[in-house]
């Protein structure tokens, strides 16, 4: 009897093991790695407030300069390992393209600087709103600069979002300047990069090359005048600052890998992981205020985003049929 039960139990375990192995194989077959890459990229960006909060002892401008410098160092290593320097010569001879990337570098540095300052000034919630608004700002920029025509549903989404921003302006007594500045600088950056001929990694490398001399001069000035926070920081803070290179480049590499493998409509939905995580971190971990008035304003913007995203998904599916 015991032998029979033992054999029956072993057979059941073998069947369970085979079923589990089949499940894993089917999951690997059905799961698009692009989804994993994109999810990881947006999740890392969503966790940025925790990273920058850990560097609160360093001033926002100095932190920005370190981010530029360490990003440049890390990207130089990545590009050298991958032997991807053939693009640089033609780009350096193209003055118009260089001017465009100089402009995008300025917008990128402004976006980084505003975000770093907002996080360390206790305005993570307001910063998250900027990235919720950003997709709708992209729609408006496409209409204004690329002569794209807005569909009725897109007009509805933009109108509802504008009503949400107007509500937050009224209850706070001033527009959400940080949110708007982040959305506009990142929207402008995206517009310039959309019309550029370089890939994501090459473009960021060129931008940091253009920004790095200014960053190094500023850091040298701080150090020579005794105002460097890095000089007096603990070892852990210095290591975190040095990690700004991979922290900046790795999610971008993941994003680029994901964007090549999944539809744009899916990428558009996954991108909301970033501001959602930032909002949760601001409210739950750092106890930033999020009252009824904020729920109404953000609710209007979330409704607009839901309308905008669903319309995009429906159109994408219809186009594939």
Tell me what each language-model feature is:
Residues 3-40, 73-101, 152, 204, ...:
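Membrane-interface interhelical linkers
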Residues 20-62, 163-195, 217, 321:
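Glycine-/small-residue-enriched transmembrane alpha-helix faces in small-molecule transporters
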Residues 39, 43-47, 51, 102-119, ...:
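Hydrophobic alpha-helical transmembrane segments of multi-pass membrane transport proteins
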Residues 55, 63, 67, 118-119, ...:
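Hydrophobic/aromatic residues within transmembrane alpha-helices
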Residues 75, 153-169, 182, 293-312:
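Hydrophobic transmembrane alpha-helices of multi-pass small-molecule transport proteins
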Residues 117, 134-154, 276-295:
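C-terminal transmembrane-helix exit sites in multi-pass transporters
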Residues 129-133, 200-210, 249-284:
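Helix-helix packing/entry segments at the starts of transmembrane helices
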Residues 175, 272-321:
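C-terminal-most transmembrane helix of multi-pass membrane proteins
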């Amino acid at each position: 009897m015991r032998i029979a039960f033992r054999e029956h139990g072993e057979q059941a375990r073998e069947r369970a093991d085979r079923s589990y192995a089949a499940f894993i194989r089917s999951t690997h077959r059905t799961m698009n790695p692009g989804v994993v890459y994109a999810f990881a990229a947006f999740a890392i960006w969503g966790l940025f407030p925790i990273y920058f909060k850990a560097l609160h002892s360093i001033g926002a401008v100095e932190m920005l300069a370190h981010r530029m410098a360490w990003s440049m160092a890390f990207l130089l290593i990545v590009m050298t390992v991958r032997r991807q320097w053939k693009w640089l010569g033609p780009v350096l001879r193209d003055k118009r393209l260089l001017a465009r990337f100089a402009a995008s570098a300025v917008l990128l540095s402004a976006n980084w600087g505003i975000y770093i300052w907002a996080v360390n000034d206790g305005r993570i919630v307001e910063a998250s709103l900027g990235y919720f608004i950003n997709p709708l700002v992209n729609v408006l920029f496409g209409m204004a600069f690329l002569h794209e025509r807005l569909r009725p549903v897109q007009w509805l989404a933009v109108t509802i979002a504008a009503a949400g921003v107007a509500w937050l302006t009224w209850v706070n007594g001033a527009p959400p300047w940080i949110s708007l500045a982040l959305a506009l600088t990142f929207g402008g950056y995206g517009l310039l990069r959309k019309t550029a001929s370089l890939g994501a990694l090459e473009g960021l490398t060129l931008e940091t090359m253009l920004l790095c001399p200014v960053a190094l001069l500023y850091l040298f000035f701080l150090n020579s005048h005794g105002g460097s926070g890095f000089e007096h920081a603990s070892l852990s803070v210095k290591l975190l600052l040095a990690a700004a290179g991979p922290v900046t480049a790795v999610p971008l590499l993941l994003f680029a890998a994901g964007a090549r493998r999944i539809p744009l409509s899916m990428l558009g939905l996954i991108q909301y992981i970033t501001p959602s995580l930032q909002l949760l971190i601001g409210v739950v971990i750092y106890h930033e205020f999020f009252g009824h008035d904020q729920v109404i304003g953000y609710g209007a913007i979330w409704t607009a985003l839901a309308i905008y995203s669903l319309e995009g998904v429906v159109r994408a599916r219809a186009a594939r049929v």
